[in-house]
A protein has these predicted regions:
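AAA+ P-loop NTPase domains with strong preference for DNA replication initiators
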Residues: 1-85, 89-123
C-alpha cells in the first residue's frame, strides 16, 4: 500500500513538473511541442497552471511574499510583472478553460486555449 501511494505521488509530481515546464516555455514565448492535456490529466494540470499564475501575480512587485509553488519561486520572479486588468483577465480565461474541461471539448483544445491565453515575456 505504501509503495502504491508513493508511486501515485511520484506520478503526480511528474505531471506537475511537466505542466510547469510547459507553462514556463509558453510564457517565455516558445510553442511547446509536447502537451500535458489528456482527459486524465486535465483537471490537475489546470490547477497547476492556476497556482503558478496566482503565484506569478503575487510575486509581481512584492518581495518576500510567500508563494505556494516555492520550487518555482526563482523562475516566477524572473517573469515580467503581471498585475491589474491583465491578471484579472488571465484568471477569467483560466476559469473558462476549467469550465470547458468539464464538457466534451477535447483536452488538447483546452490546453491550446490556455497556452494562447498566457501572456508572454514581452509586455
Amino acid at each position: 500500500m505504501t509503495r502504491a501511494v508513493a508511486a501515485l505521488g511520484g506520478e503526480e509530481e511528474s505531471l506537475r513538473a511537466h505542466v510547469a515546464r510547459w507553462f514556463f516555455e509558453s510564457v517565455e514565448g516558445a510553442s511547446p511541442q509536447d502537451t500535458w492535456a489528456t482527459r486524465e490529466t486535465l483537471d490537475d494540470g489546470l490547477e497547476t497552471i492556476k497556482t503558478l499564475v496566482r503565484d506569478w501575480i503575487v510575486a509581481s512587485g512584492h518581495d518576500g511574499v510567500a508563494l505556494v509553488s516555492l520550487d518555482y519561486a526563482e523562475r516566477l520572479g524572473r517573469l515580467r510583472s503581471l498585475e491589474g486588468r491583465e491578471a484579472i483577465a488571465l484568471l477569467g480565461k483560466l476559469d473558462e478553460a476549467q469550465r470547458l474541461a468539464r464538457t466534451n471539448v477535447s483536452p488538447a483544445l483546452v490546453g491550446e486555449l490556455v497556452r494562447m491565453a498566457l501572456p508572454t515575456m514581452s509586455p
